[in-house]
C-alpha cells in the first residue's frame, strides 16, 4: 500500500495536520483552491482543485492512488472527505450521520428521540409563527441550522427582540433556516473525543470562554477543564449516548455543552469532526498527551487508532486577541515567559467594530505550562 495521504484544505487550521502527517512518514497530497494559504507550500504535493467539485476531486484523487484521506476542524471539508472515503472503500460515518452533524435542527431531533436532555426548540423559517413559542420561556437563543463559528447566533431576552434576531439568523443561513431554543445557563465546555467502529473515547474536556450575549464568540480555551472525576465520568457517559444517537462511528467528535448549577449536561451542538480554533490540533496533544491528529490520520487510512501517549500532559491554553488589553497581556507573556508560548498566529489590526463572529478576532497565541 502507498504512503500517499490526501488532505483536504490548505489554511492555517489545516496546516498542523499536514505537518503531523509528514512527521509520521506520509507523502502529503493537499487539495484546495489556490489562495496562497500556508498548506500550499507545506504540502509535499499541492493540487489546485476545488474540494467541493466532487467529480473533478475524485478524478484527481484516483491519480494519486492514496492510502487514505483526512481533514480536521472543517465542516465544509467533512463532506468531500467522507465522499472520498466511501469511494475508496474506507469505513467512515454514514451520509445520514453527516447530514445530522451539519444541521443543528436534525441534531436536536436525533438527541430528543434518544431521550437525551436538552432545551425546548423549534425550527424557524421565513413564514415562522410566534404562536409556536407559547410554551417557551425567555431568554432564547437562535442559530442558523447550517453554520458554525458563531455566525448568525443571537441571544433573545424578550419578545421585543425576536423579529430582529430571526432576521439576523436567517440572513446568515444558506438554507434560510434557523433553530430557536430556550437558553441554557451555565459554564460552557467541549469534550474532545475520538470514535472508531462505534466505540468512543473522551480524550479531554475543554473549558471555554466567550464574549457572552448576544453573539457568544469564543475568546479562549483551557484544557483540561476543572471537573471532578465524578463529573467527568457523568460527562463521558452522556457524550457517548449523544454520539450514538447521531450514528457517529468514525473520526474525531467535538461536542459543545453547558453544565447547569443543577448538574444537567445540555448540548449546544456536536460536530463529527475535530474542534476548530486549534482545540484539536494543538491543545489536545499538549493537555492529554494523545496524538489526536495521528488518530484521525489512522482512521482516515482505515486503521485502528493508537492510544499511546506521545508526551507528558500539561495545561494548555489558547487566548484570542480582541482588545488592546489582550494585546498587552500577550506582549507581557512574550517578555516574561516566552518559553510558555507554543504557537502564535499572524496578527491583524485591532478593530473598534463589535465582535460578531470568530473571523473578527485579531489573532491568537497558544501556551503550555
What label would you give each PLM region?
Residues 1-96, 302-306, 350-352, 368-369:
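ATP-binding N-terminal substructure of ATP-dependent carboxylate-amine bond-forming enzymes
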Residues 94-105:
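A short, structured active-site edge motif that brings together acidic residues
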Residues 103-179, 185, 197, 225-237, ...:
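Active-site nucleotide/adenylate-binding loops and adjacent lid/helix of ATP-dependent enzymes
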Residues 113, 130, 295-369:
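Peripheral (often C-terminal) accessory segments that flank ATP-dependent C-N-forming ligase machineries
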Residues 150, 271-287, 347-350:
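Glycine-rich phosphate/pyrophosphate-binding beta-alpha loops
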Residues 169-177, 182-225, 233-267, 271-280, ...:
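Phosphate-binding core of ATP-grasp and ATP-grasp-like enzymes
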Residues 282-298:
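Gly/Ser/Thr-rich active-site loops/lids in small-molecule metabolic enzymes
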Amino acid at each position: 500500500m502507498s504512503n500517499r495521504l490526501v488532505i483536504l484544505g490548505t489554511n492555517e487550521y489545516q496546516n498542523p495536520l499536514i505537518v503531523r502527517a509528514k512527521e509520521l512518514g506520509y507523502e502529503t497530497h493537499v487539495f484546495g483552491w489556490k489562495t496562497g494559504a500556508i498548506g500550499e507550500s507545506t504540502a509535499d504535493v499541492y493540487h489546485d482543485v476545488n474540494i467541493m467539485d466532487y467529480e473533478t476531486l475524485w478524478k484527481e484523487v484516483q491519480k494519486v492512488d492514496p492510502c487514505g484521506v483526512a481533514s480536521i476542524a472543517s465542516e465544509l471539508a467533512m463532506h468531500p472527505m467522507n465522499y472520498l472515503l466511501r469511494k475508496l472503500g474506507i469505513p467512515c460515518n454514514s451520509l445520514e450521520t453527516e447530514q445530522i452533524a451539519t444541521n443543528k435542527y436534525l441534531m436536536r431531533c436525533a438527541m430528543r428521540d434518544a431521550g437525551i436532555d436538552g432545551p425546548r426548540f423549534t425550527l424557524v423559517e421565513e413564514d415562522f409563527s410566534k404562536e409556536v413559542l407559547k410554551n417557551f420561556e425567555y431568554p432564547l437563543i437562535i442559530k442558523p441550522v447550517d453554520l458554525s463559528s458563531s455566525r448568525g447566533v443571537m441571544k433573545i431576552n424578550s419578545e421585543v427582540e425576536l423579529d430582529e434576531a430571526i432576521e439576523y439568523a436567517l440572513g446568515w443561513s444558506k438554507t434560510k433556516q434557523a433553530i430557536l431554543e430556550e437558553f441554557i445557563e451555565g459554564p460552557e465546555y467541549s469534550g474532545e473525543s475520538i470514535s472508531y467502529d462505534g466505540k468512543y473515547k473522551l480524550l479531554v474536556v475543554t473549558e471555554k470562554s466567550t464574549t457572552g450575549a448576544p453573539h457568544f464568540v469564543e475568546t479562549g480555551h483551557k484544557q483540561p477543564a476543572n471537573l471532578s472525576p465524578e463529573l467527568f465520568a457523568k460527562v463521558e457517559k452522556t457524550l457517548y449516548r449523544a454520539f450514538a444517537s447521531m450514528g457517529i462511528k468514525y473520526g474525531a467528535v467535538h461536542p459543545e455543552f453547558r453544565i447547569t448549577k443543577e448538574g444537567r449536561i445540555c448540548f449546544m451542538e456536536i460536530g463529527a469532526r475535530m474542534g476548530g480554533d486549534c482545540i484539536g490540533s494543538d491543545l489536545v496533544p499538549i493537555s492529554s498527551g494523545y496524538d489526536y491528529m495521528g488518530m484521525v490520520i489512522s482512521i482516515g487510512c482505515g486503521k485502528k487508532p493508537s492510544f499511546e501517549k506521545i508526551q507528558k500532559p500539561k495545561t494548555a491554553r489558547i487566548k484570542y486577541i480582541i482588545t488592546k488589553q489582550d494585546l498587552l497581556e500577550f506582549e507581557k507573556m512574550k517578555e516574561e515567559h516566552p518559553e510558555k508560548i507554543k504557537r502564535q498566529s499572524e496578527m491583524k489590526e485591532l478593530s473598534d467594530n463589535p465582535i460578531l463572529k470568530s473571523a473578527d478576532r485579531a489573532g491568537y497565541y497558544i501556551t503550555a505550562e
